[in-house]
């Protein structure tokens, strides 16, 4: 569950979980998102594992998915234009 606590009406966010933690995947998906406005800035890319809807300020979105069975680190980013470089984190899958 993600709550967008931003106060600016233009500050939408999402959470996009990626298939790995590689900089190449993060950059490719983040850059491709800028051309994916019709799909809420989530690009059609094999590097995308799951994604929330865009959350406007004050909104809460929930993502239900099956975590990868392979232990490792999986990046998540915000793909709203210009956000992915600073808005990212890591989900760790352990046994």
Positions of predicted regions on the chain:
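Extracytoplasmic beta-sandwich strand-turn segments characteristic of Greek-key/jelly-roll folds
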Residues: 22-69
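Short, solvent-exposed loop/turn elements at domain surfaces
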Residues: 8-13, 24-26
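Extracellular/periplasmic metallocenter environments
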Residues: 3-10, 49-95
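Proteins with a high burden of low-complexity, intrinsically disordered sequence enriched in S/T/G/P/A and R
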Residues: 1-2, 25
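Short loop segments at secondary-structure junctions
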Residues: 20-21, 95
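Beta-strand signatures of extracellular beta-sandwich domains
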Residues: 14-18
């Amino acid at each position: 569950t993600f709550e967008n606590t931003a106060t600016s009406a233009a500050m939408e966010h999402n959470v996009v979980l990626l298939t790995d933690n590689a900089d190449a995947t993060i950059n490719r998906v983040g850059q491709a998102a800028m051309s994916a406005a019709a799909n809420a800035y989530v690009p059609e890319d094999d590097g995308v594992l799951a994604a929330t809807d865009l959350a406007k300020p004050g909104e809460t979105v929930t993502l239900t998915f099956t975590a990868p069975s392979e232990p490792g680190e999986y990046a998540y980013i915000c793909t709203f234009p210009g956000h992915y470089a600073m808005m990212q984190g890591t989900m760790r899958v352990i046994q």
